[in-house]
Design a protein with these regions (language model features):
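Active-site neighborhood of divalent metal-dependent phosphoester bond hydrolases
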Residues: 30, 43-136
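N-terminal active-site segment of His-dependent metallophosphoesterases
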Residues: 1-53
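A general structural motif
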Residues: 29-31, 60-62, 141, 189-191
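Short beta-strand-to-coil "C-cap" segments at the C-terminal boundary of structured domains/repeats
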Residues: 251-254
């Protein structure tokens, strides 16, 4: 069995598939499974294709889907629409556009509240899929897959004792810069945490201090800043796809 791990695809289906295929993924090979470390949607223009891929993998028992903050933002945005008070970040982060892609409705109909019933009907399969298929974290051998980080205490710099519990503060952990949490000491002995959410160039720039955080794209090898940040107990893989145009893919084999 091979496990292909991606994160923060943000509706860039082609970039995701390019990364998967380049790393040997075969959609027809039932022993090839996919981990998505959250944020499958928003920002890009291929939300529907990403959803169709995820539903196919889930139907075949080949998907591990970790809940990201943008999945939560999707629910928040729909709630805002129902209350006719859509906050600006839902527009700037691309969540409204994601709903437009899934529903075929335009910006003014959604924000004006004219087509709420139609929107709710068309979004229901997407929301139900997220509810039924996402988890706070997934594990494989000595690897733990999360979106931001595992629940931890910034003061004690330790991982919460109850981090595996459904009562743990995963809502906050999803927004955590995992590299920063790891750096301050929130680690799990003998485990490697694979995370997304925060562009991995942050770790190269601020922690390893060997690459620019946002190098100009006319620089030679600028893409290297966005390669996975790897250190003892952490692999951060968010490639900042909306900026770089590519997705990182980690391959693990049983």
């Amino acid at each position: 069995m091979k496990i292909f791990v991606v994160s923060d695809v943000h509706s860039y289906y082609d970039a995701m598939m390019d990364a998967l295929i380049a790393n040997g993924f075969d959609i027809n090979n039932k022993s090839h499974k996919v981990v998505i470390c959250g944020d499958l949607f928003d920002r890009g223009k291929q939300a529907v294709k990403c959803f169709e891929f995820a539903t196919q993998m889930a139907a075949e028992g080949r998907l591990y889907y970790v809940l990201g903050n943008h999945e939560e933002l999707l629910f928040d945005c729909i709630n805002d629409m129902q209350c006719r008070n859509v906050r600006e970040h839902h527009i700037t982060h691309g969540t409204v556009d994601t709903i437009m892609q899934f529903t075929g409705l335009n910006y003014y109909d959604l924000l004006g509240g004219w087509c709420l019933d139609e929107m709710e009907v068309k979004m229901k399969p997407v929301l139900d899929f997220i509810i039924d298929n996402t988890v706070d974290f997934a594990t494989f051998e000595d690897y733990i897959f999360v979106h931001g980080w595992v629940p931890s205490d910034a003061k004690t710099r330790k991982v919460d004792d109850n981090w595996t519990s459904v009562d743990a503060n995963w809502a906050a952990a999803r927004w955590e810069n995992g590299m920063q949490a790891w750096h301050r000491g929130a680690r799990i002995p003998d485990k490697t945490i694979v995370c997304g959410h925060w562009h991995c160039s942050w770790g190269h720039s601020h922690l390893h201090q060997d690459r620019k955080e946002f190098p100009a794209k006319n620089r030679v090898d600028w893409q290297k800043s966005f390669e996975p940040f790897i250190d003892d107990g952490i692999i951060a893989i968010d490639a900042c796809t909306a900026y770089t145009g590519f997705v990182n893919c980690l391959v693990l084999e049983a």
